[in-house]
A protein has these predicted regions:
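Glycine-rich NAD(P)-binding loop of Rossmann-like domains
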Residues: 33-67
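Phosphate/diphosphate ligand-binding glycine-rich loop within oxidoreductases
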Residues: 1-34
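Adenosine-phosphate binding glycine-rich loop
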Residues: 174-175, 182-204, 208-209
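NAD(P)-binding Rossmann-fold cofactor-contacting core
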Residues: 74-91
Length: 211
């Protein structure tokens, strides 16, 4: 039985839109205002970061990562990426191999869109998080195995101005007892960043089957 990997251009668009939405959430301080609303507290003005001054690091620059990079470049963000193999992508500075620490330290926002492999398992651990900027944010839309969740929880508790936008977890659905639900600097979505649209997926598989 042949195995077909679905490359859905519309999924790429959905993933990119989700990423942009969470970047704007962080960039425009919406999470702070949301938490203030819950407390009935008028927090006052906060100056947002301009696009050109925000460096977004894409961890895993494959098919979907490229969609994110293209959208962010159009909007004048500074886009960098880390990937396993060397590559040239227009308007994206690529980091590889041992340069991962430089990639982490250069990013205001890190978007993890890594696949689940032995090499990516718990790649975002205590050391990784320690090298992220104090007021930065992490978006995970790849696979839950990429994050060592205990390390992330500890980092979030110790750094109130660090934000995490999490669409995937090691075990889903996320248990109601999980500490992630309780943290004010966490936004959780139920694995919806790249929902597969049935009709285009069926058409894609059929086109490959005919070949």
């Amino acid at each position: 039985i042949p195995i077909i990997r679905i490359k859905d251009e519309e999924m790429g668009e959905r993933i990119a839109n989700y990423s942009l939405a969470q970047i704007l959430n962080y960039q425009l301080n919406f999470k702070i205002f949301q938490n203030s609303q819950i407390k009935h507290y008028w927090s006052g003005e906060r100056t947002p970061i301009d696009n050109k001054n925000l460096t977004v690091g894409i961890l895993g620059l494959g098919f979907l990562g490229n969609h994110i990079a293209k959208l962010l470049n159009k909007l004048n963000y500074n886009v960098i990426a880390y990937k396993k193999n060397r590559a040239k992508v227009k308007n994206v500075k690529i980091y590889t191999g041992k340069n991962i620490i430089s990639f982490i330290k250069s990013s205001d926002v890190i978007i993890s869109i890594l696949p689940s492999t032995p090499q990516t398992n718990n790649i975002i651990d205590k050391k990784f998080l320690k090298n992220m900027k104090k007021n930065s944010c992490l978006i995970n839309i790849g696979r839950g195995n990429a994050i060592e969740e205990k390390d992330l929880l500890n980092h979030l508790k110790k750094n109130k101005n660090f934000y995490a936008y999490l669409d995937v977890f090691k075990n889903e659905p996320l248990k109601s007892s999980s500490q992630f639900w309780k943290l004010p600097n966490v936004t959780i979505t139920p694995h919806v960043a790249g929902v597969t649209a049935i009709e285009p997926s069926v058409k894609y598989m059929y086109s490959k089957y005919k070949k």
